């Protein structure tokens, strides 16, 4: 799999562009959920953008049990093992008439977002918002294993994306070549 290393500035700019895309669509979320890790950062920028454009939202990050690149294939093969953590606030506050926006950095297999929606639906029952939308910076083409698809997306790619904060699953050589600013800190 080809790895593509992303720069922080591009993620920031794309996150604001994603916020504008959501705003221009007419969708007005009342809750934004950023999926920890990458989706939480994107969610912060989207929330700030929407707030500046006059859309007030409640916002929170949720975490799934997906640990990253080394475990990707296991997650694809056994999606029922994905756990969703940190839903209590949403369970206590979401209602059927809320607009829920789920934000992630990359939409790949769709299993993580499916796990979040299933967990919320199970707990909220009739209070599950009727309007649930998905926003992501990237969609990995050909990897979706669900019936979901992003409602808002900026880029399609088949590359494995490596975000600026990611180190797990990278060799020392890859870090030295693609993240030279980090390499000196990792020498023991």
Language-model-derived ranges and their functions:
Residues 1-188:
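PRPP-associated nucleotide enzymes
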